[in-house]
Amino acid sequence: MAAITASMVAELRAKTDAPMMECKKALTEAEGNMEKAEEILRVKLGNKAGKAAARITAEGVIASFIDGTIGALVELNCETDFVSRNDDFLGFANEIAKLIATQNPADVAALSALSIGDETVEAVRTRLIGKIGENMTIRRFQRFEGTKLASYLHGTRIGVMVAFDGDEVAAKDVAMHAAAMKPVALSSDEVPAELIAKERSIAEQKAAESGKPAEIVAKMVEGSVQKYLKEVSLLNQPFVKNDKQTVEQMLKAANTTVKGFTLFVVGEGIEKKQDDFAAEVAAQVAAAKQQA
């Protein structure tokens, strides 16, 4: 068998981006044959991706890309906050944000079939799972086209993209405001019906407990719903930089119109696994007693 040299390991790592020890093991198994070692690594990295697929990915990053009047916002998830700061992971997020903007995929499946260099997005994802050792998923994205765009990233965990006409500084202020105040819709009439129904139900329960006449209760409920709509609609919210005016008033003064926006928060709505270490230890002790 040919001796496995450091230069061979380095060459295989450059070709596959796999960890050094994995490269050395593959070369040893392939008896120094570089092509065979590459095949071995592809299988191993693919197996790692398969094993990781069931693990929850509630951490990650938001990446954005704007080029003129096209842009995209994407959420790429991983398992831990540590990996969300990995350079390869961050680079992948930025690459797919650019792809979404320039190639206009219909959904995540279509995005996964697009190419980054000589690899598909899915192949890069699988390779990175094998290299980093954590599951990662492209959760969602939003693409914009045909309008002025502004974006704001709060670190890498909150991202906003705003479509607008008018002043770019005002639009960027709106993006920052949205990241801080997290509106659910541009205006009151765009708030999703299911959210309004939920808020109305809560208001009805609270009002019913007051013991007041039905007509008063009805007014209390309607007042609560209207207050909620103002609180969660972007244009009606007090502007974060000057709460004496609403966002709508600020935009009017800046002769700017916001056409729409998208707000992504990493892991929003994903149920994270909670490790109960006390229960885990108790289970291990019980199992040990049964074996004794």
Curated annotation (Swiss-Prot):
Annotated TM spans: none
Listed CDD domains: UBA_EF-Ts
Highest taxon listed in the record's lineage: Bacteria
Keywords in alphabetical order: Cytoplasm, Elongation factor, Protein biosynthesis
Localization in the cell: Cytoplasm
Name of the featured protein: Elongation factor Ts
Main subcellular location of this protein, as a coarse class: cytoplasm
Record's keyword annotation contains Calcium: no
